[in-house]
Amino acid sequence: MPNNPSLKQDKITGVLYKHPFSVTAFLVLVVLIATGMQLKSGAAACVVQVCGYLLIIGYGIYLKQTKRLTPEALIVLIFAMGFVLRLGYVLYTDIATRQNDAGIFEEGNYNYFHSGYILYIRDHLALPAGDVSKMGEYYHPPFHHIVCAAFLKIYELFLPKGTHNYESLQALSLLWANFSVIVLYKDIKLIGINRESCPIVAALISAAPICTILSGSINNDNLSVLLMFTAIYFGLKWFKEGGIRNIVLSALATGFGMMTKLAVGLIAFSLGFLFIVKLIKDIRGRKEGLRTFLNLVVFGVICAPLGLWFEIRNYLNYKVPVTYVLLSDNIYQDVSRYTPAQRLFGFYGFPIEDYYINLGSDGQQDYNIFITLIKTGLFGEENCRDDFLMSITGYILLLIFLVVIAVAAAGMIYTVLTLKKRDSFWEDISMVIMCVTQIISLTMFAFKYPHICSIHFRFTMMLALCGAVFFARISGIKLKGSNKDLITKITGVIAAAFFILAIIFYTILWTYVKGEVTVVDVTW
């Protein structure tokens, strides 16, 4: 949207634009107090969503009529729609639905899933003792579980004695997911995109299906994503502005992120590149170079102990490898019989016939790494094939997402070819490094652990950042002549279509009732 000096600033959207974190936290707290993060029916949650959408759209029309729909106001409204979407999703999705390795919450049952991990820490105020390689999900670093345990401990002070509401944990999930979207947008802005592309990027990320799925998830993925984006943000700020505060905050976010999920450390490739570039630039000036070097020492001193103490503890006590990952024993998901060529290039009816995940129990397996990544990025592990409405909506959403991916891929090529034309030269290179290292890491992990569950978009959220930046690069292209904004308009339509279809899909998902699941004998 071009800058129009005749537009006036709206006070409400102005406050929301300046204080998104505090407003979001307040709203989540209100929802927690009012609902306990659960409603009696999916229909009630849908009513909340639809009323929220209508209110936001109505307010947007009012701002348009009164000439106060500034680009900033439009972005606020877009993010508000995303908040309402995720709120409704959480209210109709309980902690036993669309979860990954969560297990069942039951008092005194310290199962080897995330639920048992959280309850153990809550009840014992200590970490579980023992060889984590024999304790299921307990191999994960404990920061997320400590936060959840502390939250339950405090929240239960306000409940009648002896009662529990584990659904309340989704208040944290909802908070982390909304914060992640906000920080992701701030990352993209800090890297540098033009003003016209900002609402387009906001539409791409605010209703992103993977963020909606994570908003109801109680495992450690959500918090790790937030801390990863936060580490990138303050790392970028330090690269641009310097300052001990920025490097300390980046180190804390990286350290706590790795203490949530070790894979957060993968950002070291892209951030490390920027840190080295800054050191080389600043070393020309003796004092400035020394200051930058000491800043990096501070980063390492903070980040390394926070991020690695748990893995080192397990190695010293039980010889558990630092990069240990729990192996799946689900034979239905075993795809080791497929060749590397099949796993990279095999296309089996996708996207025409087969656009929901195949986990093997019905005799069909998703063995292609990138097809599985796309499916989980849109639908998680949900399968709505037996519902006509969900199938049609999901299929259209998939087709639009493929267009988004194509534009982002073209944007990466364009970014590389036009690096010297932008002030964000080094930042753009770091995005390319981030994208390449994420894809290589994903591929290596998939080959090392050849199970369908080893591939999920929630493991590759850095691609959301890279993809949005590259999409914005295409959106910002100006043509010559009277149609100079044509590409911006086309990419805007694509982003708007993705935004609308994602909202529709995850607004009506509550209506889906899973049919009888057919489980076949393994034939491979």
What does each of the following model-derived ranges do?
Residues I61, E167-G192, T230:
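Transmembrane-helix motifs of polytopic, lipid-linked glycan transferases
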Residues V28-G52, H164-A177, I357-I439, A464:
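Membrane-interface anchor segments at the N-terminal boundary of transmembrane helices
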Residues L190-G192, A231-N246, G257:
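Membrane-interface transmembrane helices that cradle and orient dolichyl/undecaprenyl
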Residues F293-A408, L509-W510:
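Membrane-lumen/periplasm interface segments of specific transmembrane helices
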Residues G60, K64, F239-K240, I267-V301, ...:
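Perimembrane helix-loop-helix junctions
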Residues I210-S224:
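Short acidic/glycine- and proline-prone juxtamembrane loop motifs at membrane-interface regions
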Residues G88-Y139, F143, K153-E156, R337:
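Extracytosolic helix-loop segments that constitute the early lumenal/periplasmic catalytic or substrate-binding loops
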Residues L74-G82, L252-A253, R286-E311, N330-S336, ...:
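Hydrophobic alpha-helical membrane-interfacial segments at the cytosolic entry of transmembrane helices
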